[in-house]
Amino acid sequence: MAVPKFKPSKSRSRTRRSINMRKKIPQLQECSNCGYLVIRHRVCLKCGYYKNIQYLELGL
């Protein structure tokens, strides 16, 4: 069975794990109906549209 020859440094270990520590920023795009920034592939919470089809009736 293979055994590591040297102990990995803190820098190497933390660099490898750092990908999990990054903040995940949501992907935003403009609503095609009102121009409000919304998360991709979701209904716009301001106007209720997604891909020019109304899914929510909002009494604004």
Swiss-Prot record:
- Assigned GO CC terms: large ribosomal subunit
Gene Ontology terms: biological process: translation
Q: Which GO terms label this protein's molecular function in UniProt?
A: structural constituent of ribosome
Q: Which residues form a coiled coil?
A: none
Q: Which domain of life is it from?
A: Bacteria
Alphabetical keyword list: Ribonucleoprotein, Ribosomal protein
Query: Which Pfam families does this UniProt record tie to the protein?
Result: Ribosomal_L32p (PF01783)
What NCBIfam families does the entry give? rpmF_bact
Family membership noted in the UniProt record: Belongs to the bacterial ribosomal protein bL32 family.
Q: What is this protein called?
A: Large ribosomal subunit protein bL32
What is the protein's species of origin?
Borrelia hermsii (strain HS1 / DAH)
| Gene name of this polypeptide | rpmF
